[in-house]
């Protein structure tokens, strides 16, 4: 099923029993987090808080609180269908030359479909039904959550940030958290390697001292939101990818104060500029690690204009120790990653990012091992192939008789197939998540690879153990008489 905007998605979720309207007054300060956290852990519905205390705008929370709703948002009926999206992205990332005329014709519809999904610019849009400018701008109108007791201020969490580099034809979409520090000021927390930060850096180099235009869309359609967090190849824009997911071109409208283009159906849009050199201390905030992050300095966005739909919906979330909504997104997007990795490394059978590992800090990979040292090649490939795994601290590589998603299996393999000295790969001075306070230096730390495969000649001189396998005939016999035994 495809959804034209956030409201259409909300309506369809409600019809399926996947959304609950909360009519009791609930505070955005701590209370919404507590309710959403309990609901997510119970695999419950999305929540629409219709009467946030002190505000007239309803708050939508826990929208992607189950992998199934993430799949729905990407236009799939089941989480398993996300593998097909991954296969499409893998093909678009590295398309293979046609093997012949027939093969070329078979691939043509894919490229036609991609070309046909170029975004469409419109002149009028719901996101500009109401326009607030100048001194009338007040971010205090938005029911921005304060998620945890130690949070320093309200935090915008689902802002889809739109930027454009001076030397680029295409816009960048990114989701960065934004601390509210005044009626028209927010802190743009983007890390130095992220697209928005790179665009801003290039702007400052080419236009020193000039204000940099930025837009933040809140409450875009689900395909556009999820397109911004998916590993889309550089040859494909997030807006075009969202069109592929949705089955229709993404409609955009030019901002009223800049040439940036934002989703026409967004609920709320913040337009503004970053003045080079204007920085502010951001944090502390409770984060997806389960800890409060340290304070650091980031650019300040001055909001010059707020546009929104009539009776807008504010889309929000919280981040904390997994499981949280980003962790659930990680579980679903894991299925997209698998075919992309398999395209580059066909020996990979499965790839798993455990949500309790903050969704990216640990990976378990199962392979069809083909030669000594194979596991080490794969772990190095995982670290280098996709930028999404730049911060993965631990990579465990096992044979394909192990279930990567079963810790009982993985721990058994670690303790029986691995020698700590021989089978551990340590790499120092590598990029590490800025939020990882365990690293000796902010943004720089080490990585560990664990070769948990059965060892081949050349890797060991010892006779390798043979795994115990049950006798099939005996198993069938006991299956037949089991109920008669009366044990259960």
UniProtKB/Swiss-Prot annotation:
Q: Which organism is it from?
A: Pseudomonas savastanoi pv. phaseolicola (strain 1448A / Race 6)
Instruction: Tell me the cofactor note.
Output: Binds 1 prenylated FMN per subunit.
Entry keywords, A to Z? Cell membrane, Decarboxylase, Flavoprotein, FMN, Lyase, Manganese, Membrane, Metal-binding, Ubiquinone biosynthesis
Topology term for the membrane: Peripheral membrane protein
Query: Which cysteine pairs make disulfide bonds?
Result: none
Q: Which family does it belong to?
A: Belongs to the UbiD family.
Q: What is this protein called?
A: 3-octaprenyl-4-hydroxybenzoate carboxy-lyase
Sum up the protein's function in the record's words: Catalyzes the decarboxylation of 3-octaprenyl-4-hydroxy benzoate to 2-octaprenylphenol, an intermediate step in ubiquinone biosynthesis.
Concerning PANTHER family, the annotation shows: 3-OCTAPRENYL-4-HYDROXYBENZOATE CARBOXY-LYASE-RELATED, FERULIC ACID DECARBOXYLASE 1
């Amino acid at each position: 099923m495809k959804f034209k905007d956030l409201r259409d998605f909300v309506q369809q979720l409600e019809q399926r029993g996947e959304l609950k309207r909360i009519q009791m007054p609930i505070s955005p300060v701590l209370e919404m987090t507590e309710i959403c956290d309990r609901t997510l852990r119970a695999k419950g519905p999305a929540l629409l808080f219709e009467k946030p205390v002190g505000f007239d705008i309803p708050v939508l929370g826990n929208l992607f609180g189950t992998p199934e709703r993430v799949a729905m948002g990407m236009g799939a009926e089941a989480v398993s269908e996300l593998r097909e999206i991954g296969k499409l992205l893998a093909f678009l990332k590295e398309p293979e030359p046609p093997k012949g005329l027939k093969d070329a014709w078979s691939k043509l519809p894919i490229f036609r479909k991609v070309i046909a999904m170029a975004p469409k610019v419109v002149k009028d849009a719901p996101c500009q039904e109401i326009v607030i400018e100048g001194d009338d701008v007040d971010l205090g109108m938005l029911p921005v959550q304060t998620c945890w007791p130690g949070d320093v201020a309200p935090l915008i969490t689902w802002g889809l940030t739109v930027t454009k580099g001076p030397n680029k034809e295409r816009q960048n979409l990114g989701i960065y958290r934004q601390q509210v520090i005044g009626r028209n000021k927010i802190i743009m927390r983007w890390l130095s390697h992220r697209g928005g930060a790179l665009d801003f850096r290039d702007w400052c180099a080419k236009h020193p001292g000039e204000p940099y235009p930025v837009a933040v869309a809140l409450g875009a359609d689900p395909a556009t939101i999820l397109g911004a967090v998916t590993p889309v190849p550089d040859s494909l824009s997030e807006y075009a990818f969202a069109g592929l997911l949705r089955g229709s071109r993404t409609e955009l409208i030019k901002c009223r104060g800049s040439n940036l283009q934002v989703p026409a159906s967004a609920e709320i849009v913040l337009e503004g500029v970053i003045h080079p050199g204007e920085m502010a201390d951001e944090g502390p905030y409770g984060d997806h690690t389960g800890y409060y992050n340290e304070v650091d300095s980031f650019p300040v966005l001055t909001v010059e204009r707020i546009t929104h739909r009539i009776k807008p919906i504010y889309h929000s979330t919280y981040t904390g120790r997994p499981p949280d909504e980003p962790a659930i997104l990680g579980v679903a997007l894991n299925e997209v990653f698998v075919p992309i990795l398999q395209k580059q490394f066909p020996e990979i059978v499965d790839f798993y990012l455990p949500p309790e590992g903050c969704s990216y800090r640990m990976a378990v990979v199962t392979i069809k091992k083909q030669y000594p040292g194979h596991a080490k090649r794969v772990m190095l490939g995982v670290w280098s192939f996709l930028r999404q795994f730049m911060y993965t601290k631990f990579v465990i590589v096992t044979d394909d008789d192990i279930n990567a998603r079963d810790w009982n299996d993985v721990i058994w393999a670690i303790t029986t197939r691995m020698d700590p000295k021989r089978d551990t790969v340590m790499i120092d001075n590598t990029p590490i998540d800025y939020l990882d306070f365990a690293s000796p230096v902010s943004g720089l730390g080490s990585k560990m690879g664990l070769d948990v495969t059965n060892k081949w000649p050349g890797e060991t001189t010892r006779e390798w153990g043979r795994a115990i396998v049950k006798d099939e005939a005996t198993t069938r016999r006991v299956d037949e008489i089991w109920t008669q035994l009366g044990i259960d």
